[in-house]
Amino acid sequence: MADPNIVLVRIDNRLVHGQVGCQWVGIANPNLIVVADDEAASDPIQQSLMKMTADSMGVGIRFFTVQKTIDIIHNASPKQRIFIVVRTPAQARTLIENGVPI
């Protein structure tokens, strides 16, 4: 199985917001943002706000727990250009320690 096409990883305690939408999406040109954060994965209000930013940039967005991201990231289509956003360095470390190729 090929590694997922991860084009950028960002640690940001605000997750997805205007700067992510305007600056980082423009630089990395992803077609999917994956928010790997346990709290956001279960909070529809946070998801709604982040979805507005992603929609304004024409990018898909998905919300998963850190563990779910680890479990499914290798199933990503090679056509997906994935931008992973996590809230903390500890979350990024967990992804790395569990085989997410970032």
Give the location of each predicted region.
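N-terminal intrinsically disordered, cationic/polar leader segments
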Residues: 2-8, 12-15, 20-32, 36, ...
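Short, low-complexity, polar/charged sequence segments that are solvent-exposed and flexible
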Residues: 27-30, 52-55, 80-83, 102
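Short acidic, glycine/proline-enriched helix-loop-strand junctions
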Residues: 41-71
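Ordered, amphipathic secondary-structure segments that act as subunit-interaction surfaces
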Residues: 60-102
